[in-house]
Every structure is written in structure tokens, then in C-alpha cells.
Amino acid sequence: MMSQSSGSGDGNDDEATTSKDGGFSSPSPSAAAAAQEVRSATDGNTSTTPPTSAKKRKLNSSSSSSSNSSNEREDFDSTSSSSSTPPLQPRDSASPSTSSFCLGVSVAASSHVPIQKKLRFEDTLEFVGFDAKMAEESSSSSSSSSPTAATSQQQQLKNKSILISSVASVHHANGLAKSSTTVSSFANSKPGSAKKLVIKNFKDKPKLPENYTDETWQKLKEAVEAIQNSTSIKYNLEELYQAVENLCSYKISANLYKQLRQICEDHIKAQIHQFREDSLDSVLFLKKIDRCWQNHCRQMIMIRSIFLFLDRTYVLQNSMLPSIWDMGLELFRAHIISDQKVQNKTIDGILLLIERERNGEAIDRSLLRSLLSMLSDLQIYQDSFEQRFLEETNRLYAAEGQKLMQEREVPEYLHHVNKRLEEEADRLITYLDQTTQKSLIATVEKQLLGEHLTAILQKGLNNLLDENRIQDLSLLYQLFSRVRGGVQVLLQQWIEYIKAFGSTIVINPEKDKTMVQELLDFKDKVDHIIDICFLKNEKFINAMKEAFETFINKRPNKPAELIAKYVDSKLRAGNKEATDEELEKMLDKIMIIFRFIYGKDVFEAFYKKDLAKRLLVGKSASVDAEKSMLSKLKHECGAAFTSKLEGMFKDMELSKDIMIQFKQYMQNQNVPGNIELTVNILTMGYWPTYVPMEVHLPPEMVKLQEIFKTFYLGKHSGRKLQWQSTLGHCVLKAEFKEGKKELQVSLFQTLVLLMFNEGEEFSLEEIKQATGIEDGELRRTLQSLACGKARVLAKNPKGKDIEDGDKFICNDDFKHKLFRIKINQIQMKETVEEQASTTERVFQDRQYQIDAAIVRIMKMRKTLSHNLLVSEVYNQLKFPVKPADLKKRIESLIDRDYMERDKENPNQYNYIA
């Protein structure tokens, strides 16, 4: 330990003592030392120098305009005296360290208040005007071992007018003494003037005492061996540090470094024998090697702290030499871990622990973390461990993947894969080096997923989709997204599933009644899966649309027809299944399905027919809903598609205005009876084509028809009216035993019922002759009146079907809870004739469109080959056409002289103007 005292003018002695705190100690400046008086270091006599002012005492602030640029410099400048303890250099940041030494320093100021400051061992301390490079020069200012020499040198400095406020002689146990100086500013310097620091080197450098080098090295060697053997060091660490500095100052650094390396190498070599025992268990061996490594690191940190001056001067200036810490790593790597037997046993033990953990056993993870950190510090992690680790991982998961794919169902297997990936990610965080991350995760993904992509999908995708296993599907997509090409394989299977499942809905005629609803449900299902499971991936959305378009058109025309009927069922009056808002959403969903069908003209034909019924019979649930659907169709298909449908609505509006005028006209006519006539004027080009049917109307009805005809043609001359009896409907008043009822019936039902005002019983043939109704239509009419829910007629004999010999009477005992009763007409399951007629009209319209397209193209191109003509026709048409049908239309146009075959090339056509 060193003590330092200085005399002052007031006769009191201020003492700076060093305290030991875990390492070695050194005098350190205090933050409050600026108030401490600067005194001259003499032989103990009171200085005759006048007391220095407070301004002059603050040496650092008065000597440089940049005094605040370094905290360390400020602290040192403000001390009352300076020790010969060397400035400490910062540690190499690249050297790992698990501990550090602190210097505990207390400086007694003039106020006698101890101020404690701790400096980290790595911190830089430097005197004003000195740095590490001046180590040798500053040593020349050291006095000999006697205090007299120090006093003599101080007198020399005074004679040379060097401004040095104090010089302290410090005597060391090793016989060397060294003084350091604190430089003050010029006392008489003017404010704002330039301030100079004058430092003059000492001329003489004292010689080392005899045997000093050997004795000093012996002390250092004993200290190093004590550290290596974990015994107490009998020398003060500060003394040892100073000894190293002294040796370095006298250019003995090279030999000192060599000796230090040798003693460290000898100690490490002696450790290898304990690891060559074959009887050691692998875990015990790992613990032993880890303990050896931890001890080595701790020892090298302490050794380096003693030889820090050597590390920061000589070693730093010689780039070919490793630092003391790196030297320790090299020696441990060369003599311990590079031993093939030790290395193999270490790597085998680490791999065994990892394998046990993967099998579910509990292991010492901190041991693994320490050992793998050791391999990384020794720079053999990748070459010695990582390659073998990845090979073992690949082997383990390859076997596991093959086994579990056969034993487990897909959901269980997917959860297992996810668990494995999470475990490996945790290992990377806990003890593996981050450089292993990419290779490790890629290996697991390849063996558990990449090798089984197709097998997983073929084995379980359909079940997951059928059962709507949202969580499992989400996990499936998440895992497949990690593997290169995984999403593409999933996408292909996704398309195949939609096509296969959708085809079962469309192709099977038995599902016609529920086809549209099933399509809507299926569409909702796949949309939900895409949104939740596939994260709205655009590729899956487009693939779904293509798949729907493919399977829904496998059965031409029928889906379009059924979609039209489904819309009719939703827009018809009496549909109380949904609110207006729900109905609007339903129509939006139907339009999505509608986009997929090719035969939109088929939809239009059936939709128009059903719309006509709703409008004429007043069955529309909502005019707003009807117009909303019309707007959606117009937006989807264009104005040309909906022009006729819009014309139907216009006809209904005009008919209302005409009937108001007709009622005013009727008030001036003397017409017997109380029949009220309502007529809808329909433009033939807008409405579906109806087959006219001549029936025998009662004279009263005929009379009213003639009156209306006279009225209408009087306003619109040149027009022709054609009565459509199939669309007529009436309200009859009837009296039964239970009371009066109103019957809402068709015109044909009306004609049959009115006959029973003239008689009580009629045969089928008699009714047919009297009404003139066509046989099939009459049978359906009688069936609705005598065999339906509201049986206002009785049939003899009883039965569900109408036979030739059947007779009918009025059912006077008819009962019903309602006053107005609607008796529905029995429809021929879309009457085969009516359906065929509608389809035929569609085909006829298509022929016209094909002919028009061919003529337009030929008129523009004049001459064209068959293949190019067919290609351009396909591009213009909005519905599918078979090549054979297209060829027939071309032949038809040739026959009608619209075009001709080229005489030289039969495969080429010429337009005929």
C-alpha cells in the first residue's frame, strides 16, 4: 500500500489513502477535489510560497479552454496531489469478461469529508499533459530511492521556472520511486489570454536495482500460480500492477510476455490428463470440462488485470501478438479442446443431451449453454459442433416424419410439427448459437413438412375442408407457408377440392331443388376459409373463382335456369324468411354465383318469364327488391341485358294510367252487371312469348273486352290487341252452407266454376266442350279444384288424378277458415312443354346472335380462314357454342348467300356484298 502526504501552510496534513475493494487500489481523484488546495510536496517543511487563490487552485479549469471534454481528465486535474500509480487503459471491448475489478479510492479534502469514488478497471485515467506514450519519459522524473534526491530535483525544476504546483515522492516496496506532477496555470495570466502548459522531460533515468527483474518476475509468477491454484495472493495487486509497468518501462515487455505465455501454457497442459479417463460418464465429463473452462476464464481475467499495462502497451503495438485474453483462448483451444479424444467426447456428450431433451427428458440447459458458448468463443462451434448437430437433426426428423405420417391423422401430425418447430426455436434462444438458426429450422421444415407435402394433403385436406376444421386449416396454411413450394401445392389441392365438391352439387339431377342453396352455402364456406385460414391470399381467391366457373358450367344451362327460379322464390310475395336487409344480402350472394355461369341468356329467359308472373299476378314481395335486382343485373351484364326487363316495368306503370282512364270512360257507358275489368297492356317485344289459347268466355266478359278494345284503339289507332287468356285471373264470390267466400282463381278455373251455376254435375268431356280449354290444361285445372287443399269441387270416383270418365259436382260442404281463398293452379313441374319452349327460344336467340356475329366479322374482314373466323366468333359471343353448332350456322349463311367458300381454298370464306 502507498501513502502520500504533503505539507501545507496551515500546518495540517491532508492524507490520501487507498482502500482495497476486491482488486487492487489506486489513488483516484474526487469530484469534489476542485476545492482542495494545491500544495507543494517538500520534505515536510512548511512552504513559504504564498497561498494560491481558489481560481488558481482549479488547475484543470485554468489550464485549458476545453476542460469539460473528459470526465476522467477533470477528476484527475482536481486532485490535490498525484500518485505515481499509472494511468489505467480501457479494456479491449472484444475480450469477453464475466467480472471486473473496481478501484476503491477515498480522497480527504481540506474539509476532512471523505469522498468515495469507484472507477471501473476498464476506465481511462490520465494526467494533464501526460498519456500512455509518455510512460518512459515520465519515468525519467522518478527520483532515486532516497527522499533527498526527490527534493533536489524539485529545486532544479524551480530554478528552471517550471510551473509545477506539487511533486510527490512515492516509495514502493520494490525499491523504485516515481514522482508525478500536477501542472498549474500561470498565476498572473490575464483573463481571455492564451494559457500554456509547459512540461520538460527529466534528463536522467534511474537504473534498475540489481536482480530487480528476476525478483519482480518471481513475484509475478507466484501471483499467477496463486491465481491458477485458487489460493490467496500474498502481494498487493496494485503493487503487482506497478511492477508490470516498471518492467515495461525498461523495455522488458517482450520477455515478460513470453514468460507469462509459458507459465499459462504449462498450467493448461497439466489439465489435459483429467479428461482422458475413460471411466467418466458423459454428463460428468461435460461438467468437468465446463468447470475447467469457467476456471480458466476467471483466471485469465485476473491475470490480465495484473498485466494490463503490458496488454495495453507492448501487445497493442505488436499486431502479430494476441492479447492476453486471446492468448488464453488459443492455449485452451490448442491443448484442451483440440485434443481429438476430448473434443469428440465433448461433442458427443452435447449431442446426447440435446437428443435426450428432444425425447422429452429434463436436462441441465445451463450446462449446454455454457459449453456451446465455450465452443463459440474458441471459434470451433461451426466446424466441430454445428455440422454434426445438423446431421443428427436431419437423421432424427427424417425417421420421425416417416413414422408419424403412417401412425397419426393429419391434424395430430400438424400439431406435432408445430410443436417441434417451437421447441427448436426455444433451443436457439436458450443455448444454441444464432448462426445455427437458418440451417436448423430449414432442416426440421424439410424433413417434417417438405418431404410429406403431397401425402399430408392427399391424406387429410378433404376431411379438414369437409368438416370445416378452421383451426387445423389455419395451422396447415401456416406450416405450408414456411416451406418452399408448399403454398403452391396447397393451392392445387384447393382447386381440385372445389371442383370435385362443386361437381357433386351441379351434376346430380336429384339435387336440382337444393342446388342453388347448396352452391351459396359452399361459397360462404370457402370464403370463410380463405378469410380466416388462408389470410385472404389473393391466389386462393382467384383459384376459387376459376374452380367455381369450371364446375358450375359442367352442366350447361341448368344452373342458370335454377338460379333464376331461386331468385323468383325469394322475390315472390309470401316469402317471409328474411327482412329487406337480409334479402338484399341474399341477392348479392346470388349475383356472385350468377357471375360464374356462361349461359346468362338462359338465366335471362327464365328470369323474365318468372318476373312476368310476379308482375301480372301481383306476387312481387317488394317493388324495391325487384328494382334492386334489376340494377344488379344491369351492372353485371350491361344495359342491353336488362332493357326488356325494364320495359316490363314500364308497361305495368302505363297500364295503371290506362286503367284510370278506362274507369272514367266506363262511367259514361251503360254496361249491365257488376264485373270489374282490369287490363294490363303488354308490349310483345318485352314480355315472354305466350301461346294464345282460344276459350269460350261468358257473354258478360266478351262484352267488357269489346268495350275496352273500342276504348284503347280509339286512343291508339293502328295497334293490335291480342288477349292472353292463360294470364287472366279473377275473384269469384261463392255461397256455401258455411257461408260466403271469395275465391281467387285463374281464368280457366273461373270458367269451370261458373258452369256449376247452370247445373249440379258435369263430366270431363262436357266441361271441355263448354269451356274450350285444352285437354291437358283442363285436367290440371280440375285437379286443382277437386284434388287440392281447397276442394270446392267433388270428384267421382275419388282419386288424385283426373281420368276420362270422372264426373264433378259442387262441394256445398266446403269449409275454410279464411274468407278469401287463393286456389293455386297445378303447375306441370315447370311444364315440360313450357320449359322446352323457353329453352328453345334461348337457342333460337343464340342462333340469331351467332349469325349476326359471323356476318359482322366477314363484312369487316372480307376474306377469312375457318380457324380465324371461329376464333373471332368465340371472342364476341357471351355464351358457349359447340364447334358443330357453329359450323351449322356457317353453312346456313353460305346457303343464304351471305358468304361463300373460296374456290381455290375450301378452308377459306369470302364475304358476299
From Swiss-Prot:
Keywords noted in UniProt: Acetylation, Cell cycle, Cytoplasm, Disease variant, DNA damage, DNA repair, Dwarfism, Intellectual disability, Isopeptide bond, Nucleus, Phosphoprotein, Ubl conjugation, Ubl conjugation pathway
Per its UniProt entry, which superkingdom is the organism in?
Answer: Eukaryota
Question: What SUPFAM superfamilies does the record tag this protein with?
Answer: Cullin homology domain, Cullin repeat-like, Winged helix' DNA-binding domain
Q: Composition bias, kind Low complexity: at what positions?
A: 25-35, 60-70
* Intervals of motif Nuclear localization signal: 55-58
Q: Name one Pfam family in it.
A: Cullin
Q: What outcome follows a substitution of K58A? A: No impairment in nuclear localization
Q: Which residues carry this modification: Phosphothreonine?
A: T49, T148
Q: Where is the Cullin neddylation domain?
A: 845-905
For the region Disordered, give the residue spans: 1-100
| Pathways involved | Protein modification; protein ubiquitination
The post-translation modification note in this UniProt entry reads: Neddylated. Deneddylated via its interaction with the COP9 signalosome (CSN) complex.
> Record keywords: Glycoprotein included?
no
Task: Quote one Gene Ontology molecular function term.
Answer: ubiquitin protein ligase binding
Kindly list the positions at which Phosphoserine occurs in this protein.
S53, S100, S146, S193
Report the sequence similarity comment from the record: Belongs to the cullin family.
Q: What does this protein do?
A: Core component of multiple cullin-RING-based E3 ubiquitin-protein ligase complexes which mediate the ubiquitination and subsequent proteasomal degradation of target proteins. The functional specificity of the E3 ubiquitin-protein ligase complex depends on the variable substrate recognition subunit. CUL4B may act within the complex as a scaffold protein, contributing to catalysis through positioning of the substrate and the ubiquitin-conjugating enzyme.
Instruction: Name the PANTHER family for this protein.
Output: CULLIN
Q: How does it assemble?
A: Component of multiple DCX (DDB1-CUL4-X-box) E3 ubiquitin-protein ligase complexes that seem to be formed of DDB1, CUL4A or CUL4B, RBX1 and a variable substrate recognition component which seems to belong to a protein family described as DCAF (Ddb1- and Cul4-associated factor) or CDW (CUL4-DDB1-associated WD40-repeat) proteins. Component of the DCX(DTL) complex with the putative substrate recognition component DTL. Component of the DCX(DDB2) complex with the putative substrate recognition component DDB2.
The record's disease note says: Intellectual developmental disorder, X-linked, syndromic, Cabezas type: A syndromic form of X-linked intellectual disability characterized by severe intellectual deficit associated with short stature, craniofacial dysmorphism, small testes, muscle wasting in lower legs, kyphosis, joint hyperextensibility, pes cavus, small feet, and abnormalities of the toes. Additional neurologic manifestations include speech delay and impairment, tremor, seizures, gait ataxia, hyperactivity and decreased attention span.
Q: What is this protein called?
A: Cullin-4B
What organism does the record attribute this protein to? Homo sapiens (Human)
